[in-house]
Amino acid sequence: MKNVLSIQSHVIYGHAGNSAAVFPMQRLGVNVWPLNTVQLSNHMQYGHWAGSAIDAAKMEQLVDGIAAIGALKRCDAVLSGFLGSPAQARAAVEIVRTVKATNPNAWYFCDPAMGQTGGIRPEPGVEEFIVAELPELADGMAPNHSELQKLAGQRIETVAEAVAACRSIIRRSPQVILVKHLHDRNSPADRFNMLVVTETEAWIGQRPLYAFPRHPVGVGDLTSAIFVARRLRGDSVRAAFEHTLAAVHAVVKATYDARRYELELVAAQDEIARPSEWFGAWVTGAD
């Protein structure tokens, strides 16, 4: 069984960060080692919360503890999400380097949370660090539309521009870019676009866009988690993308139908593993 070290925020109540990522990856047959960068009572969109961030040095100490018992060599991948400070971002880099030094076959997938995530905004300097440092280290990245623009340093309005932006990042090191949400001026307003790009291929997929009165938090974290889990299970990029598109839709639809604010992960767990509605992905020739 594959093992992934997941470095993200955590909420006790609800689903955001690791609270949105751990269970879906486990449901897909992957062992998850959660390292929580932030421990909160709930996500901040509620307007009231309690909690704090973990000290960056403690992040490295925790991973050193795993290494001390000889288990770090069994880590197959690292997934990072919300990093609250430049110090946490630097610690994440050192952790990835340690994992890769211990297991040269391990890979790193970066969800570059640069904006407000669940109401949490990173400290000044995090965005600049992510843009400057993480693409050279990552084997894959999962930006949303805004984050893709920041990573590529350009405005993006079409699929063609998005593919070109992804390829510019791939030239820095990552082998795959998953765009979790792509705004395309040519797409219908009631569709949610996702895109995945490699050096030589690109696929786009669409699912229905639901009009929530309050949009649930954690959808992006869920998206990255499912994609990583499917890749760890041996899926091709396209197969992992199509499964992710279908499974995330199933969770979002279950949440919408139940009129909930928090993602219905447990209720939709069978759909995460075996989605009943598939949307497929088609090759985009945009260069």
UniProtKB/Swiss-Prot annotation:
One of its GO terms (biological process) is pyridoxal 5'-phosphate salvage. It catalyses: pyridoxal + ATP = pyridoxal 5'-phosphate + ADP + H(+). It comes from the Bacteria. One of its GO terms (cellular component) is cytosol. Pyridoxal kinase involved in the salvage pathway of pyridoxal 5'-phosphate (PLP). Catalyzes the phosphorylation of pyridoxal to PLP. Its cofactor is Mg(2+). The keyword Chaperone does not apply. Substrate binds at S9, M44, Q45, D221. Pathway: Cofactor metabolism; pyridoxal 5'-phosphate salvage; pyridoxal 5'-phosphate from pyridoxal: step 1/1. Gene3D superfamilies: 3.40.1190.20. Belongs to the pyridoxine kinase family. PdxY subfamily. ATP binds at D111, A142, E147, K180. Homodimer. It holds the Pfam family Phos_pyr_kin. Keywords: ATP-binding, Kinase, Magnesium, Nucleotide-binding, Transferase. SUPFAM superfamilies: Ribokinase-like. PANTHER family: PYRIDOXAL KINASE (PTHR10534:SF2). InterPro entries: PM/HMP-P_kinase-1, PyrdxlKinase, Pyridoxal_kinase_PdxY, Ribokinase-like. This is Pyridoxal kinase PdxY. Its EC number is 2.7.1.35.
